[in-house]
């Protein structure tokens, strides 16, 4: 049993050992936000640099249509998935797109697309989903 007036010592000791816990340390130093290209934001705008096809992981066999995007706010480059049948046709180089998280576990990639954590939601301020459905035409800039 610790002494009657040992609370301060116990508390400071616990505080010191907290830093050995990886989850506490990453949370306290905000390492996930610092490493995130979107800097903790839910969405970000960017300019399309090029279109890329990424092969799906085993056991699936497909080429997932993605785009390389340079973010406007910090200049970092990310790869974003273009969801929808024929969606890549509505995205051209130098278009302005809005990207958001793809919805994988713990902010990671989803399904069989390796290393892709984001998806395109808007192209030139028009919803990509609406363009794929045929409800809206892509505006000419």
UniProtKB/Swiss-Prot annotation:
InterPro entries: NA-bd_OB-fold (IPR012340), Ribosomal_uS12 (IPR006032), Ribosomal_uS12_arc (IPR022863), Ribosomal_uS12_euk/arc (IPR005680). With S4 and S5 plays an important role in translational accuracy. Located at the interface of the 30S and 50S subunits. Part of the 30S ribosomal subunit. CDD domains: Ribosomal_S23. This is Small ribosomal subunit protein uS12. One of its GO terms (biological process) is translation. It comes from Methanothermobacter thermautotrophicus (strain ATCC 29096 / DSM 1053 / JCM 10044 / NBRC 100330 / Delta H). It holds the Pfam family Ribosom_S12_S23. The keyword Ribosomal protein applies.
